[in-house]
C-alpha cells in the first residue's frame, strides 16, 4: 500500500466585491419547467439554461425541480421573499409547438428587468 501524503491547508479565498446585481440576485433562483415527453423541450431548456448562466452566472438555474406538467414550458424567477415572477409561459401557446419556446434573449431581457 502506498504511503499517505499530508493534507495541505487551503489558502484563504479572496473576498470578491459584490456588485449591485449580485445583491439583488441573492437568494433568487430561476426555475425552468419543461415537459419530459419529448426531447425538444429538454433541448430548449438546456439552451435557455446556458444563456441564463452566461448572462447572470451568480444566479442559480434549476431545471425541473419537481415533476413537470404535461406540455409545459415555463420560466419562473423565485425571489428570496418567496414571491414568484413568471418570465415566460408557453402552456397555452401552440400548435405549432415552436410557439411554446421563447428565444433565449427574450427571457434574458425579461430577467434583466426584474434584477435591476
Swiss-Prot record:
Record-linked Pfam families: Rdx
SUPFAM superfamilies the UniProt entry points to: Thioredoxin-like
InterPro entries recorded: Selenoprotein_Rdx-typ (IPR011893), SelWTH-like (IPR052674), Thioredoxin-like_sf (IPR036249)
Covalent cross-link site, Cysteinyl-selenocysteine (Cys-Sec): 35-38
Annotated TM spans: none
Highest taxon in the source lineage: Eukaryota
Keywords, in A-Z order: Acetylation, Redox-active center, Selenocysteine
Residues where N6-acetyllysine is found: 20
Family per record: Belongs to the SelWTH family.
Biological role stated in the UniProt entry: May be involved in a redox-related process.
PANTHER family xrefs: SELENOPROTEIN H
This protein's name: Selenoprotein H
Organism annotation: Mus musculus (Mouse)
Amino acid at each position: 500500500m502506498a504511503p499517505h501524503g499530508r493534507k495541505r491547508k487551503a489558502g484563504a479565498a479572496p473576498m470578491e466585491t459584490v456588485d449591485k446585481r449580485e445583491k439583488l440576485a441573492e437568494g433568487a433562483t430561476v426555475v425552468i419547467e419543461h415537459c419530459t415527453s419529448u426531447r425538444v423541450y429538454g433541448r430548449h431548456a438546456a439552451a435557455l439554461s446556458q444563456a441564463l448562466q452566461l448572462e447572470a452566472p451568480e444566479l442559480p438555474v434549476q431545471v425541473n425541480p419537481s415533476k413537470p406538467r404535461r406540455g409545459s414550458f415555463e420560466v419562473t424567477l423565485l425571489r428570496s421573499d418567496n414571491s414568484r415572477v413568471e418570465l415566460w409561459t408557453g402552456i397555452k401557446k401552440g400548435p405549432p409547438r415552436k410557439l411554446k419556446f421563447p428565444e433565449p434573449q427574450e427571457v434574458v431581457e425579461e430577467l434583466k428587468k426584474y434584477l435591476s
